[in-house]
Amino acid sequence: LQASREELVLRLAYLQFTADLRVKFQYNNLMFLTAGYLVEVLNHKSWEDSVRELILEPLDMKRTNFSVLVSEQDKDFARPYLYREKKMEKIPFRQITNTAPAGAINSSVREMSNWVIVHLNGGKFGERQLLVPSTLEDLHLPYMPISQTPPHAYVSPASYALGWFVDYYRGHQRVYHGGNIDGFSALVSLLPQEGYGF
């Protein structure tokens, strides 16, 4: 039996702290689940319906979905593979319905580029203003340092913003976030001041 989103969020009250608030960076997908559940409570509809209406439809992301079962019906979908014992092996899709806000969006490079455009174009897609510029600034603003040691000579120590990692490469701000699930990896990376994204 899988717990519902509400049950998972309510159980977080029993999660023991491993560090005080804002003392140590700790990435936790359950917080994305919590944010998704809050969207459901405030909008009186599922997280999926809210994302579809507020993001996917305005961005013309018609093939993007929340279920691997839907993805499998698409004429052009990717299959998950795992490199094991020196060979590529096809593995089953992993469906994460109850924790969908933490990583169940299935998309394509073409459709994800529309999401990137919004972040590089001051919140606009075509003629439609989806986010006000100050909201984008808030999303990309570092709130929590991750480390004090730079990973490379040309990259600053990273921080975490609102759903984005932020660092500086040779003085250029980089805003990025990856996602992984069995057989798949993805990365969205932006250089907002330069207007580049992939």
Give the location of each predicted region.
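Short, surface-exposed loop or secondary-structure junction motifs
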Residues: 1-182, 187
